[in-house]
Amino acid sequence: MFKEAEELPHAISHFSQIMEIIGDKKPLLILDYDGTLSPIVSDPNKAVLSKEMKEALIQLAEIIPVAVISGRDRADVEQKVALDQLIYAGSHGLDMVGPEGLEIPQKVSDYILDSLKEAAENLQRELKEVKGCIVESKKFAIAVHFRNVAEEEVERVKDAVIKELHRHQNLKKGTGKMILELKPAIDWHKGRAVNWLFEALNMNKDSGIPLFIGDDITDEDAFASITKEGIGILVGTHGEKTAATYSLKDTDDVGRFLEKFFQTMKGHGKL
């Protein structure tokens, strides 16, 4: 059931309820990066992980599997977090690696990669004069950032993206917070990535439970995929109804939740 973000119970205020759901199961903790682990900033290159958040991830990774799944390139988010113990997934889960040789099989054809390259070149040429617009060419996607674009120019940005989507039928549109994406038109998203990871780690619903924390509309696929057998926590709001079951206010709230979660897990589930 989808709800407004304001209707969700606060994850820290209802922490004991979350721990009851987890029970004796081993959690798989999965987090988005931008807007969840690091505040959203006008320049995506300046989204930095705080020392406190990094310490929380280090502590948790010692006792449970921890993954970061981002729309960024995997190498980018891996460099920003810079912790060897974690599992990293870029391009909404298309590119994933982790400890002990964990790696997701390649799912994107050379044909699609060629289309992404051509579309990126076209968009960079078309939008180079739009002040504040950033065309970010990634390994498996193109992100067009318009957060800093003047309101009267936003439509021009959107039209350019639509034009490329019409030109390249093997690409599809993705949306986020002040971002438009062109990505492979294949049946893959964060929800499928979470399910794949859960199985790849030899976890099952009887002994394990996924806990996903994210802030963006792209995280809804993950929330929806674990609604019955996991816990979804929405950070802030993305303006649409959500399949998440709990909420946190912001990245600071995420940090407080992770610290409380670690202390509880370390104490073998005793509150």
Where are these regions (language model features)?
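Hydrophobic "anchor" residues on beta-strands that sit immediately upstream
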Residues: L28-I30, I87, L211
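Active-site phosphate-binding/coordination module
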Residues: A47-K138
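Asp-based phosphoryl-transfer active-site loop
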Residues: I22-D43, V68, V194
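A general structural motif
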Residues: D24-K26, I63, Q85, K139, ...
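Short amphipathic alpha-helices and their capping/turn segments at secondary-structure boundaries
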Residues: H10-K25, A75-V81
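Conserved acidic, metal-coordinating active-site core of Asp-based
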Residues: V130, E136-I213, I217-I226, G230, ...
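Mg2+-dependent phosphoryl-transfer enzymes with acidic/Ser/Thr/Gly-rich catalytic loops
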Residues: M1-A11, D24, G191-L271
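Short, basic, glycine/proline-bearing loop/turn elements
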Residues: F2-E4, T36-P44, I209
